């Protein structure tokens, strides 16, 4: 049946096309957006997620349209993690979160929250300050010098920003010390910055007094940082036109700290004679275990309440706890223990840095139970809470990490109050050239889905991405995108197809949450995550790859076959172009090209044509 229909040509966006200038990719031009292949009659709860770089989503229209067009759910890569929203003093800034949630939900996307409780990317400066020993209130305050520098004799500074670019210079005087000549008012205070002191030995969590003898040609503020390149405290140091000894208190976050000064927003001269750090010599009293617990419940309450208020009820599902299970240890029942700051040779990726292990202080059960209680207290009434972890498809230990996680969920829920709704499996995996390795990982992916289904919990593939490994070495290096062959790209596409279909085959409809493709595009060579690997469904220029077709086949259960074999009418006039129902003109222009298109309805010569 054909019906007359007028169509306005609309150019396809680049993310709707395969790589230009290569006939191996032309078939990808004809596919619809990924989400159009979801069969909601069979899988009404399924959500197709895309890992999202939030700053890119908010600033790059091509990237934003790619996410909005292809996915039904968006997951922030980092923007909703604690360290992205909370500074070293516990101040919370959710402005980016609010803008992201509003933009995505107005585009019709479901926003999945990632993550409420974790040990990595935490505001550890703030948390460590909260747990710091308290000075003995019965003792008299007494300070002792820790470090000092007199610029009248020590005429040097450490690393500094470019003087010519930012319009400043430094000189030294035997009477006035360091003189900073600022001739340009810059956009940012940190445009002019320099290390005044380095390698200051401090005790983390302890408060120190800094005294600076300083003046300026006009009154102003020096901006400061005591810490390292990742963490620190940032008080301002006010000065006038007269010499003054200015005192500022700092709480040490980093044991071996530098002292940085910034004055990019000041025009004039700043004079600094000397700087001195002093520490309180009074005996400190550590918090009791009960005080530490209550302090962290306060911090967790403030964090979760703030995030839930920022999301305004729009984010209805969360990774409650991320990466809790260690890949080692014994919990006394033959399962792996929880991750902690010490004791696991292979279970912890990132001790130090911004890591803070809540369970070290709160206990393995209380940590998760408190997070769950607060999420349900402040979140929407219908909130769903997941435990998310990696290596749940582990073939080297027969899925022991997943079995351990399922056992830990039973422990957390044993109080009769805590309820975990679902399990998220990250699936940062590889496709293997070696058949033995490939079959082994596929066997344990199948077993993973079976175990998750048996748990009765909602099942979500939360961060799926894939590399490619050649040779027989199970732990061999992944092939870089630039070195991949067409056959290897297509083998990865087949692997994606198989995983998606295996999810639908093994996870009951009522337990399906969905699958999130963590890396939508290939990883740049300088990325800290699988740098230079072919992990995306689009390349770095936003063109579709063969893996896109693998996802389509997986979602669609293979190509539809109901009208397979029906031949095109040879009289069909394709000279005026072939269009999709949304009015976008396809690159196909011949009858043979129409024959090669995916099955569906198209507009040809002003009529609807079933192919």
Predicted features along the sequence, with ranges:
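Extracellular beta-strand ligand-recognition surfaces/modules
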Residues: 226, 245-276, 312
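An active-site-proximal structural segment forming one wall of the substrate-binding cleft
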Residues: 78, 129-140, 288-321, 364-378, ...
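C-terminal outer-membrane/trafficking sorting elements
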Residues: 562-611
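Beta-strand acidic-aromatic groove motif in beta-rich domains, primarily in extracellular
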Residues: 189-195, 218-230, 257-262
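Short carbohydrate-recognition loop motifs
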Residues: 166-189
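N-terminal substrate-binding region of glycoside hydrolase catalytic domains
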Residues: 14-99, 103-143, 147-152, 158-160, ...
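Aromatic-rich peripheral "rim/lid" segments of glycoside hydrolase catalytic domains that contact
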Residues: 86, 128-139, 278-289, 324-325, ...
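Extra-cytoplasmic beta-strand recognition segments
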Residues: 139-153, 178-184, 194-220, 244-252, ...
